A protein has these predicted regions:
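Walker A/P-loop nucleotide-binding motif
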Residues: 146-167
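N-terminal pre-Walker A segment at the start of P-loop NTPase domains
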Residues: 114-148
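N-terminal nucleic-acid engagement/recognition segments and initiation subdomains in replication
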Residues: 1-71
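Structural recognition of the conserved hydrophobic beta-strand(s) that form the central parallel beta-sheet
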Residues: 183, 216-218, 247-253
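Interdomain "pre-motor" coupling segment immediately N-terminal to P-loop NTPase/helicase cores
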Residues: 55-112
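Post-Walker A helix-loop "phosphate-sensing" segment adjacent to the P-loop in P-loop NTPases
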Residues: 170-182
């Protein structure tokens, strides 16, 4: 950092000390600080080099110089035991970026597009009136959480935006309630669980999911269902979340009746209706069946 003395040594023919001091004192930011803090003559003398440092750093900041090292922070003047000093505070842009990063860090997406982290309820297209009932329920959940615990089971046609809606919910829960959510593509999770059998990691995968603060199972019913996955994986997750009263959301192309039929189809055509109903009892307890209307957006 170049001091006042360095400036005078470098350009002795152009600057005299008093001329430089007057130039520094006339700087609008410096003058405002002097008036605000009611600096005495002694304090002014002790502060000249810091005022010069401030002006240099401020101008670099405003120009966006590449050699400005405190990226995301702007220089400010503060009092420091009888003289002015230079400090740095976060810019509004850095604060906003850090806030958005914190929001996204609370959203865990598993086998889903990272772009869903950008979704928010404010982006929901309400010109499509079919979305309004679901939008209102999701908004109410955010506003009333944690008093409200029951999730939604969103079903509807392919491409109407079910995944976007629940991702928007997760974003707003993070932003407004500081809540962490796990958004999980269920068919891919089923494959991951099957692959984990050989490694002995099934319990680790299941525990990670069932303990989520808010859990969203996306596209349930699209997986290749087996009795083992249904009874030993899904039911374990749902049972835990039911017992602990943890918010759980679902999306599906099936309504409740169709999903039960999906779970009831055994590997060899066996009727497994009773087992399917046990799973559905837990889903019904955890989530309200809600149809999402709308146009295909894909």
């Amino acid at each position: 950092m170049e001091s006042v003395g360095d400036v005078l040594k470098r350009q002795p023919s152009r600057f005299h000390y008093q001329d430089l001091v007057q130039k520094i004192m006339k700087d609008p930011d410096v003058a405002a600080f002097i008036q605000q803090e009611s600096l005495t003559p002694e304090e002014l003398n002790r502060s000249i080099s810091k005022f010069n440092q401030y002006i240099t750093e401020r101008d670099k900041f405003l120009r966006g110089d590449t050699d400005y090292i405190a990226k995301g922070y702007k220089p400010i003047l503060v009092m420091n035991h009888g003289y002015a000093d230079v400090s740095y505070e976060e810019t509004p842009e850095l604060i906003a970026a850090e806030k958005e990063a914190a929001i996204k860090n609370r959203l865990k997406l598993i086998n889903l597009p990272a772009s869903l982290k950008k979704a928010s309820l404010a982006q929901v297209d309400l010109d499509d009136l079919g979305r309004l009932p679901v939008f209102e329920k999701l908004l109410a959940f955010v506003e009333q959480y944690p008093a409200i615990r029951k999730g939604l089971y969103l079903y509807g046609d392919f491409g109407v935006g079910k995944s976007f809606m629940v991702a928007a919910l997760a974003h707003d829960l993070s932003e407004k309630r500081g809540v962490s959510s796990t958004l999980l593509h269920y068919p891919s999770f089923v494959i991951d669980v099957k692959n984990a059998i050989g490694d002995g990691n099934v319990k680790t995968l299941v525990d990670e999911i069932k303990l989520s603060e808010v859990l969203i199972l996306d596209d349930i019913g699209a997986e290749q269902s087996t009795a083992w996955v249904r009874d030993e994986i899904l039911q374990v997750i749902l049972q835990y979340r039911m017992q602990e009263n943890l918010p759980t959301f679902f999306t599906s192309n099936f309504n409740f009746e169709e999903l039960e039929q999906h779970f009831a189809r055994g590997k060899h055509g066996n009727d497994e209706t009773w087992e399917a109903r046990r799973v559905m009892e837990r889903i019904r307890y955890l989530a309200e069946e809600t149809r999402l209307e709308g146009v295909n957006r894909r």
